[in-house]
Curated annotation (Swiss-Prot):
It comes from the Eukaryota. This is Autophagy-related protein 37. Keywords: Autophagy, Lipid-binding, Membrane, Peroxisome, Phosphoprotein, Protein transport, Transmembrane, Transmembrane helix, Transport. Residues 335-409 are peroxisomal. The lineage of its organism: Eukaryota, Fungi, Dikarya, Ascomycota, Saccharomycotina. It comes from Komagataella phaffii (strain GS115 / ATCC 20864) (Yeast).
Length: 409
């Protein structure tokens, strides 16, 4: 019976690790801290026994010390409970907790139904029967049974062909998971050697001498067959769970954010508060933004850069245009120098008439240089840029004519 309890207990440990790997990012809520601490105390009592003599109560006022005290008190509350009874309570309490807090997803319901089915097969059997049979058995028989149980556990976990179809050394986290199980292969070999030693000291009588002692009956044979069927079913379930765990570990091996998942999670991780889960969820939400949002953000950023560049070039062009306008105005506006008629000094009428079209002015003998394309105010506006340029050109021609006349005179 103890062997069956151990098998279901191993299944419960695998179930809680699977649930822990789904908590925080798959929508599966964590149970309250009281439930987790209770499970922690039962787990420590089932695997290590009483806390007295193992460790002292932690001291300190820090949050870590308070959490350690809470876990130590939960372990201490199970003082005096046998390991087998602690395993039974652990399985039963885990099933009740899963019914309340881990029944929202299909995977969680499947895990719960599998664990509950296995538990119903052995929950009605009294633990006293198993304890009595163990107390009557010799040390060699106890060690042999325990070694067989552990060897069977190791064969399910460590067989690279039946568990994953590949070398488990390929994934470091898978290797840590195998080494962090309850016992390793070397310990099982030592237990086998101890059982052989006790068998040599107290050899077991042959089956013929025990045939009439009432130890083997049809009822016991049926029970053993039923127990073997249960063990085979559990082995198959563990094999399937290991395959699923290997797939998850292989898919998350290249992702540093989720490198600590699945079988890497311990009971301490399960008990600790999820203080950093909210920041992790925000980070994952940013990572998992839809493609449309990313494209929209990229387009907006490009538009902002384009607008900034256009404004910069427009400002530079405006400054250049302002400087050019100022230079043109300063070079064009010449007050009191532009006029349509220029009075000249009295010169010789014949020379001027030969060089240019000069008409005599009867008013005081003054002469006027006539440029028809400049004289017409109706043709060009005085304030226009072209009109001002033509006036400047007219003044220049008048100035050159004066110089030539002065030299000739």
């Amino acid at each position: 019976m103890s062997e069956s309890i151990d098998r279901v207990f191993v299944k419960a440990i695998g179930t809680i690790r699977t649930l822990s790997s789904r908590t925080g990012y798959g929508g599966l809520p964590r149970p309250p801290i009281e439930n987790r601490v209770k499970l922690y105390g039962l787990y420590k009592q089932a695997t290590e026994g009483d806390v007295a003599g193992v460790m002292e109560r932690p001291l300190g006022d820090s949050p870590e010390a308070e959490a350690a005290k809470r876990k130590w008190d939960a372990w201490r509350s199970e003082q005096g409970t046998s390991k087998t009874e602690a395993k039974r309570q652990y399985i039963s309490y885990l099933i009740d907790t899963m019914k309340q807090f881990a029944s929202d997803t299909t995977e969680a319901r499947e895990l719960l139904s599998e664990l509950e089915y296995l538990w119903n097969q052995i929950s009605d059997v009294s633990p006293n029967d198993s304890s009595d049979s163990e107390s009557n058995a010799g040390p060699a028989q106890l060690l042999q049974n325990h070694a067989q149980l552990l060897s069977r556990d190791i064969s399910v976990v460590d067989d690279p062909i039946t568990s994953s179809g590949m070398d488990p050394m390929y994934n470091p986290s898978f290797q840590r998971h195998n080494s962090s199980r309850f016992i390793n292969a070397s310990t099982a070999e030592r237990l086998n050697s101890l059982s052989n030693y006790y068998s040599n000291l107290n050899p077991t009588p042959p089956l013929s001498s025990r045939r009439y002692q009432g130890s083997v009956t049809p009822r016991n044979v049926d029970f053993i067959k039923w127990q073997n069927d249960i063990n085979n079913s559990i082995n198959k379930l563990n094999h399937d769970l290991q395959l699923l765990a290997n797939r998850r570990l292989q898919s998350s091996a290249s992702d540093p954010l989720y490198s600590k998942r699945g079988s890497d999670l311990t009971h301490d991780d399960f008990v600790n508060d999820i203080s950093s889960s909210s920041s992790n969820r925000r980070f994952r939400a940013r990572r998992n933004q839809p493609l449309v949002s990313k494209v929209l953000l990229g387009t907006i950023s490009l538009l902002l850069k384009l607008i900034k560049t256009v404004i910069k070039h427009v400002a530079i062009d405006a400054v250049i245009i302002a400087v050019l306008v100022a230079v043109i105005k300063r070079s064009i506006i010449i007050p009191n120098l532009i006029s349509n008629e220029i009075s000249l000094q009295k010169i010789h009428h014949s020379e001027l008439e030969s060089n240019s079209s000069i008409k005599g002015d009867s008013n005081g003998g003054r002469l006027t240089i006539v440029l028809p394309f400049i004289n017409g105010k109706d043709f060009f506006q005085e304030n226009s840029l072209l009109g001002k340029l033509l006036k400047v050109f007219h003044d220049y021609v008048d100035h050159v004519s004066r110089i030539r006349l002065i030299k000739r005179n």
